[in-house]
Amino acid sequence: MVNAFETFPHLLSPLKIGNVVFRNRMFASPVNSAEIISDGQPSLESVAYFERKAMGGAAAITYGEVDVDPEDYREGRYPREIIRMSNYNYARLASAVRRQGAVAVLELCFSGIHARMYTGGGKPAWGPVDMTLPFGGQVAAMPEEKILQIIDEFGNAALAAKKAGFDMICLHGAHGFGLQQFMSPALNTRTDRWGGNTENRCRFAVMAIDMIKQLCGQDIPVEIRISGSEIVKDGYGIDEGCQIAEQLDGHADIIHVSVGAINRFGAETFSRTHVSMFYPHGVNVEYAAEVKKHVKKSLVGTVGGLSDPYQMEQILAMGKADIIYMGRELVCDPEFPNKVRRGRVDEIRKCMRCLNCFAEGVGHGDLICAINPEIGREREVYRALPAPEKQRVLVIGGGIAGMQAALTASKNGHEVVLCEKSGELGGKILCEAEVPFKQGLHDYIRLQRALIAKSGIDLRLNTEVTPEYAQTQCPDVIIAAVGSDPVTPGIPGINKSNVFGAIDVYKNPSLINGRAVILGAGFVGTELAIYLKDFGIDAEIVEMLGDISDGGNSTHKSAVLDMITQKKIPIHFNTKAVEITGDGVRCQGPDGEAFYEADAVIHAVGMRPLHDEALKFSCCAKDFHMIGECRKAANILYATSTAYAASRLIGRY
C-alpha cells in the first residue's frame, strides 16, 4: 500500500472552476450506456451505472452524446435532446451522480453528417457543404439560419440540463461530430463567415459556448472536446489543432483534447479515438501537451487508453495537462479513483483495451466489460438478496473463468477450493500474456492471482481432479472450468515437423524460422501474425471464409485490420488449405489452385470445448455448473460473465 497523497499529489488535488468544486483530477470521459428508452432518455439501468461510477470517486461523471437538433439526429440507441420532452430520467441521473459527491456533466452534440453516415436514402443530413457519403447518404450545406438555430439549441439544451441538475456542460467538438466538421479545413470549404480561416471555422463552436454562458450564467462551467489532430491523410494536424484551441481559449473553461475524425471512414482513426491495445498507453497525451502550450485561460484535459495512476501523475506533474479523463478504465474498474486515494493501486483492475464494451454497446445495446462482470448490472448487483447459506465449493480449473468463479464465491462467504492441474493460474491464454500489446491481459491475470492469494481460497496447484477426488472433497457445489483444446485440422501433412499450433508459437516464437503461413483468420491467427511481424517474421494468412472471424467484437476487428494494413500482412480469403508440404501449403482459392511457400505452417482454426471432461463431474455434488470455454469456446468476456453468474447465487436460493 502506498502513501497516496505523497505519491499522487497532483492526481488527488482538488480543482475549482467558479463555484463548482471537483474532488480530484480524475474525470470520467463522456460515454452513454446505450441503455436508452423509447423517447431517447437514459434508462434506470443507465442511472444506476452512472451512479456507480460516481461512487467510485471520480470527480466528474459525463453522460455523453446528447443530440440537440430536434429534427435531425442519429437513429437507434442514442440519447436525444431534452428540451421537447419530459427530462425526468436526466434529472434522476444528475441527482444520482451528485449525491455521490461527483460533478454531473451533460455532453451535448450536433451530429451533422453523423446522422446519415452509414445509411443511404432519406432526407439529407446537415453539414458544412453539400456532399455524398460513402454509403450513399446525402449531406446538404447548412444555411446560416440553420447554423444559428443549432447555436440556439445548444443554449436551450444546456439551460434544460442546468434545470435538471447538471453542474457542467460539455460540447462534443471532436471525433468528426458536427462542430468538428466545421473546424476541419478538409470538410469545411465554405467561403462565408463560417468557413475559410481558422477563426471562421471555429465560429460555430465559439458562438455555441457563448450562447450557453449567456443563457445559463457564468456559474456553470463549459467544456469542449476537440481533436488535437484528425490523424487522417487529408485531415488537419497538431499545428491546426493548436490554432483551434487558441480560438476556444477563454470561451470554454476546459479544452478536452482527443484525436481523430471517425466520419472519415478509416480504421486507423477509430483505433486512436478509442485507443486499441496495439498503441501505447497515453499515445494521445502529446497532443494535449502541445495544446496546453498555446492556451492561456482554459484548463486542458487529456484522454486515450490511460490506466496507470503513476503515468497519470507524471502527466500532470510535467504540466502536459490539468485533468485526466478515463473512459473504458472506469467501466473496467469504477473504483479506480478510490483505490488511488486509499493507496490500493495494486488492486486496480486495468482495462485490457479489448473493445468488447464498445462492440456490445453498439451491437446489442448492452453495457458490458470482459473483466468486470458487474458493470451494467448495478440494479441487480446492489439490490437486496437473501443472505447466502455457506457452501463448500470446488472449482475445477484455474483459468480465466475458474479464477473469477472462485473469487466471487469466496467474496460471498463460501468455503472455496480451487484446483488447477498445472503449476500456475491463468489457463491456456497464458500463452499470450507476454505479447507486448497484451500487457492488459498480463496485468489482469496478475491481479486475479494476487486477489486469490489474499483471499481465503484453498488453492491447489498441480492437482488434476478426477470424479473420485472430487467426491472426497465433499463439495456442495462443483464448478467445472476445464476449458477447451485447440482444434487440429484434418489436412494432409498436418503432422509434419514444420507444423505448429498457435499456442506453441505464442509461447515460443523462436520455433519459426523464415516465412510462415497461418491457417485461420480469427483473432488468434491475425494477432499472431502481428506479433510475429515484431520478430521480423513474415506471415500470411489463409482463411476459408470471406472475412476475419471477430467473435462478435467488430470494434476490435477494426483495430486488428488497422494493424494488418499497417504491417502489410496478406490474408487470402475464401481459400481452403488442402495439403501441407515441406515447403508450403497447397490451397484452393477463388481463382483456382494456389501454393503459398512457407518454412513453417501454424494452425489457428478454433477451440473445442471440453464438454465430456466437464460433465464427468456432474454427479459429484448436489449443484453443478459448467462455465467458460468448457461450455462454449468464446472469449474472456464469456468466461468472466458465466463464472460470475454461476457463483453469485450459490447458497441463496
What are these model-derived regions, one by one?
Residues 296, 320, 452-459, 495-498, ...:
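A short helix-to-beta-strand connector/capping loop
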Residues 58, 252, 474-476, 597:
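Short acidic/histidine-rich motifs immediately flanking catalytic phosphotransfer sites
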